[in-house]
Amino acid sequence: MRFVGGNKWLALATGLMVACGGTSGEDTTTEGAGGSSADSATTSGAGAGANSGTGGEGVGAGGQGPGPEPAAACQQTTDAIVAATGNTITVSPGPDGQVEVEGQLRTLRAVVRDAMPGDTVLLEDGTYLLPEADPSGFSGVYITTPDITIRSASGDPRAVVLDSAYRIHGGQSAPITVAAAGVVLSGFTVRRSIFHLVHFWDDGDDAVVHDVILEDGGQQFMKASGGNVDGVTVSCSRFEMTDDGRDNVWGYGSQNGNTTCYTGGIDTHDATNWHVHDSSFVGIYCDASGVARPAHGRAPDARNGMTYQGGLAEHAIHMWDAPDGQGHVIERNVILDCARGIGIGFNAEVHDTLILNNMVSSRFAGAREHDVGISVMRAFDTLIANNTVVYTHPEAYPDGIEYRFSATAGVSVVNNLTNQRIRARDGATASLATNVDDADPAWFVDAAAGDLRLLSCDVAAVVDAGTATAEVTMDLDHDPREGALDIGADECTPAP
């Protein structure tokens, strides 16, 4: 809502990623209990520590860039995480590759490995450089203990940085791997990985990733590999690719010159019941300009002299599949200048997904690096409602929303606002109602910068022109949708 002239909280108690089909990073049956570290656990008796709530510019749907300041509900979730703190293990940055715990130097991997269920690993402000792995070992944070929390003491995600520094952590392992249920990650940054930044394996159910900044993943920033990772919540977080990160994106493909970029935001396989909300995705695309990038990031044993330039990155959010009755909810996210926005399905069926109140914008030409805003493929019983998709480049990709393949069934496309086509492809059918596909960028506060809130409530084609939809009870800003619905992600309210 914008006065011209807030965050539904999923309770902690109830809420509380590898190339497709390729090799996994770490094997959860053999790795994680020991690894290459030999030091023993040391815990402190400190309390929960200070927490200033969600912080840092640009996290959640607001902060720097499009969107309001972080909603009160994001803070409510932060407060719930802090309130749930049990025994704490307080950690501060040490020399390269190490951390300090009660005067002893250890690896963060070992600290997390030795934590007990219910423990909180509390990170003091600073930068934590993760070590390079020994040739036969692993050095990333690998979580195999259920119900532990890793969070910042200050609550400021920009003040606590886990830096992979494009180092090898063993195999294709991530700086953070979740292979246990009920894990909470909150209030810090993880950045500069050759592979994924956060990787879920099949025991990583019911995790919460809240108020986390994920920056410069070499492959998809967050990955869930096959094995039915269920009930993960991603909230009030920021996924961002910088120019430097773009030069280190993983190149993927054959060695005959067809190598192309391989990165994206969230990418899940065999996952169920994920809730991705109130988060932002910025600049996740690959660039054909400039120097040739090294294929396979900075993994010299995998490059074999290969380079690449550009290519179409994965979606900011891509859920490849979900069985009947166990779909995903993707709502109130801001996606700015990413190669593709939200993707559901493709080569497998995905059921029962809700895509609600998201804003997707791009200022780039379509070319070969930028594509559709929202796409559902082989989707069943899926609702795409009250999203706003606006492209400002005169040669932008022509479609804002697509539904694809003849297998697609039970898809409803309702109350969406875009300046691009809403298009059926490959024999797909859907039910369409009260969508607008000829939006004028001048209707919005700042379309080029991704702020797609309505500048005026006098747009008759949009305001009070929507169809009542039971699943849509609030807008992007958590403001209620009362009476006649506006079309798009923003419910416009005249100034008092």
Where in the sequence are the language-model features?
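Acidic Gly/Asp/Thr-rich repetitive segments characteristic of extracellular carbohydrate-active
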Residues: 74-124, 477, 481-482, 486
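Ser/Thr-rich, Pro/Gly/Ala-heavy low-complexity intrinsically disordered linkers and tails
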Residues: 3, 13, 17-74, 79
